[in-house]
Amino acid sequence: MDYKETLLLPETNFPMRGNLPQNEPQRLKSWYEERKVYEKMKKNRQNAVKNFNIHDGPPYANGHLHIGHALNKILKDIITKTHYFYGENVRYVPGWDCHGLPIEQQVEVKLGDKKKELSKVEIRELCRQHAREFIDIQRDEFKTLGIIGDFENPYMTMKFEFEADIYKALCEIAKKGLLVERSKPVYWSWAARSALAEAEVEYEEKEDYSIYVAFELDGDALEKLGVKEASAVIWTTTPWTLPANQAISLKPDEIYVLTAENLIFAKPLLESVVQSGLSKGEIKKEFKSSLLENTHAINPLNGRKSKFLLGDHVMMDGGTGLVHTAPGHGEDDYYVCLKYGFSEILMPVDDGGCYDESIKHHGLFRSDVVDEFVGMHIFKANEKILELLGKSLLSVSKFRHSYPFCWRTHKPVIYRATKQWFIAMDESKLGGKTLRQTALKELEKVKFYPSVGIKRIGSMIENRPDWCISRQRDWGVPIAFFRDKATKEVIFDSEILDHIAGIFKEKGADAWWALSIDELLPKGSKYKAENLEKVMDILDVWFDSGSTWHAVLQSDNYDAGKYPASMYLEGSDQHRGWFQSSLLVSTAINSHAPYESILTHGFTVDAKGEKMSKSKGNVIAPQDVAKTHGVEILRLWVGMSDYSSDLKISEDILKQISEQYRKIRNTIRFLLANVNDLESLNTEFNILDKWILARAKKVFDEASACFKNYDFSKGFNILLNFLSADLSGVYLDVCKDRLYCDAKDAPRRRSAQSAMAIITKTLLPLIAPTLTYTVDEVMDYAPKIIKGEAKDAFDLVYEPIKFDLSFEDELLFASREKFNEIVDVLKKDKKIKSTLELSLETTNHNITSYDEREVADLYMVSSVRAYDDSEPLAEFELEGDKFKIIASNLHKCPRCWKFNASKEDALCPRCEEVISAK
């Protein structure tokens, strides 16, 4: 007789292979088009006690997604869904940053010379079209990653009402007195012809000159020193700024020396000066820096006087202790000259980084050579300036150092004093506090993941300068203020500001360029159009993104959740970017941080830890991963990676993740297949079921705690170890006999099935935030005992295992491990083919007191009994108890294959009973 037909073999239609690249797109379509799962999620939790929202840091609407985008959006999705599957009401509104230089440059490249023929409004419309095109592309790419959010109504900084909200935020800051316009050296990208904020500057290696230049002392300085000849020696790495030199800064209260060569240096630096060969170190005279204050030296390049000043910015860690001071090209230089009341700041460089006509008017070069320098790029002028210095150039060399570059053009930037708009950090306008003080105080209330984040952003806020928010470009929200032509005073009239905001909401910010001043003024305004002019600068895009909380979280245009947001989540570079700009705008307006918590992740790198680049051929594109492995593999990679540092990804790493996914999927499939006929849960459990449920409860509780703390890699490590070692490695294996061979309703079988059902029901919502595609697929095949009334994955809620079970017998499992080691040797020596041929005897009374069938299943032998004098195949001892492995003296049952039958080809008593009952 073929007994196979009498066995209760596992049965499920849940496929062994996921075929993820083929199946995921269909499921995604059903989520968004048929089931409307985001709306369903909102409805399911409408009465929830807790609320959670991540405010999306907007990606730039330019280009396709890269793996860093995928990491960021998947992590946001996992965290949002984690809160959802814990029963919380969640909101996630994706957004896009639409204005700014990269899009404008793309449009300029397409236009070429045609740009000159177009108006600013026409150029802006082309920029808008470009952004719209890539928003549509990126929206589909984000959704493909399994991201669930309000993609039907995302926020875009170029929407008319959004531009109006950005402008309103600017006006609120202006009304608080925190917006100031002044000339000041700022980072200037000559390649982009615009000012830059700190966040738009990156540091790269650059080769520069290192020069020492002698400035002869003028008569007043020589008189103070009581000498007839002396020169102040300055050190600089920017020869091109020497024409604009206006002063030489000395350290207050420091001792300076005049050497035998009639050169002046700071005394603490004399030793290093000697080593550099500038002097032999013989001192003729010592004096305090204050002696030269307000006296003069002569600039050897142009003969102009250079005043000696005292400045705290002068350091004794290099150079000569005499600092070349050009206030038009350096922030420290600017402030020290401001302190000394300089009425004129020289800045002879135009927007494109070339010397302008002012070098003639101010005599910044000798008259016989000045024409040669007009229109010359400053970096090309360095060599010619060195030639002109002649004998005054004491030393010249080249060196490499870290230098600021424009993040968009990747060209070196300069400091350039221009008239710009700033948000003041140190004006006491917020209830007697400054913006810097308020922002730092608010940071103390924010929870950081990882916790070191507060130190990073805190030190940046402490040390940052005023925020330069103006740009000299076309594609952005205008700083839409009027200026009185006669007085040059800026008009901050509430009626006008509100009226312009209303126009922007209706027509967009293009109206600032499209409409005349008369058309932009409210009817009946006391101001006359002919007396006004427009401010034509636009806002820094960091102000756009920094005010998104204002336009999204405090607006009726979006259902985006609360303000402040539960979380902001971006890469660690955003401490100096979006986290900071958002904090400053929010505290300037509301004296409140816009977020309750900040989570940062590292960057994606290849398997060697190197940055990805096309030239290296190590780029992993999310679109390629989706096509070859499936999005679920990418999501599991995010879940299993420690995002607090840089995340490695490569084809080999993805294959390893795929293998882990296969184990998870096959484990779930086995569980589904073996509970297919279970209709109700048992509450009485056998010892092995108690053991696995106790282990599952402990593991799920630990993993859940990790997930709640956003430590996903640790949580998955705990889970996968349990699924592999305890569940698949032990329990599911030892349960097969009772699942397949016991009677359908046998208590032992129903006990095992109940344990499996409980584990599956608990596991699914625990992994659903990460493996959403898979869990949703599981729900299509899960029996009612697992899914209950849930129609799909989005109806699940995580509930911990409630059974307070415990089963501990370390010796039982330790003896099993030792038994398996010995059995492996017996199999290799071909003494046995299967452990079912064996019986086990032991002196341990605990083990023999358990249900004999349970213990036999654990060892996967035919029987376990008390120790006697049987002849052993092998034996071992543990903790004083003896164990003897013997060959069974009974026969193999043709149905269950256990050696418990009384004679050849006969059924064992258990199988006989099951067959008879049928």
Curated annotation (Swiss-Prot):
Its EC number(s): 6.1.1.5
Catalysis performed (reactions): tRNA(Ile) + L-isoleucine + ATP = L-isoleucyl-tRNA(Ile) + AMP + diphosphate
Positions contributing to L-isoleucyl-5'-AMP binding: E570
Chief site of localization: cytoplasm
Motif window: 'KMSKS' region: 611-615
Recorded domain comment: IleRS has two distinct active sites: one for aminoacylation and one for editing. The misactivated valine is translocated from the active site to the editing site, which sterically excludes the correctly activated isoleucine. The single editing site contains two valyl binding pockets, one specific for each substrate (Val-AMP or Val-tRNA(Ile)).
Identification of the protein by name: Isoleucine--tRNA ligase
Source organism per UniProt: Campylobacter concisus (strain 13826)
